[in-house]
Amino acid sequence: NFGLDYIKSLEKEEKYNFFPSKKGLTNYGERLSLGFSCLALKAFYMTGEWQDLKTIDKEKWVQHINSFQGEDSKFPKNSYLDPVLINSYSNLGYKENIKYILKRLISISPNFNYDSKNVAINKAINAETKQAVSTLHEVGYKNNKEINKVYSIGHDISYYLNTLDWSKPWSSGAQFASMCVFSETQGLNLKSELQSFIKTISDKETGSYFKEYPKSNREVINGAMKVISGLDWLETEIHHPKKLIDFCLNNKPIL
């Protein structure tokens, strides 16, 4: 299996840590660990390699992923925290910080809705946590510490989901999907709320999920894929599957 062999070749000296590629790595990309370890584990599982590992190796890999679970007052309790990811936001260069400041000023206008740096890093941590939890559950393991608070800014889940920019469903759909994962793996019992919300933004014409039509058809499709991954966790059917299939077939990928 060429793909699996390539992934194995990316493993670092520290076992269960992987490079994202062999060349062209950034300073942070070279040192990030959690996300790439999860992706490699998924690749092992999908190719059947995981089943052939010794139990001790499986448990050590799971322990490695769970070692990132910690407490930091800036993030929901028991989130999965990769220090390198956090530092990449904390130590942004002058130009990047200026961009966030300008975007925040522009967002004063109702016509724009850019994420602040704080919101951006919280979304990143949420995505990392979702990926770790879903990966572990997929292979029959679970997180050590229960995650009973999700990034919902102190309100109920419907309120939080409505604060997201659903003209950008790829990003917002990812947040929705993470809530689905947490609901079903952490016993949060959010299923009915999540089902009710997503039904309200299902689009009968495209089969996708958004409030305001996205700027590109690729965003329509990619957003739908994110939402569908969440619906799968909820064991909920896609609302307009035929429309979505037709839309995808009529919008060929840009090569």
Residue ranges: model-predicted function:
Residues 245-255:
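Non-catalytic carbohydrate-binding regions of carbohydrate-active enzymes
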Residues 28-52, 77-144, 163-192, 213-240, ...:
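An alpha-helical repeat/solenoid feature that recognizes helix-turn-helix modules
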Residues 154-160, 164:
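Preference for long, well-ordered alpha-helical segments
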Residues 8, 12, 20, 30, ...:
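A generic structured-segment signal
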Residues 51-54, 71-75, 143, 157, ...:
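Alpha-solenoid repeat scaffolds
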Residues 1-37, 46, 56-62, 73-75:
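Low-complexity, Ser/Thr/Pro/Gly-enriched N-terminal "stalk/linker" regions
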Residues 1, 8-9, 55-60, 145-152, ...:
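Short sequence/structural elements of tandem HEAT/ARM alpha-solenoid repeats
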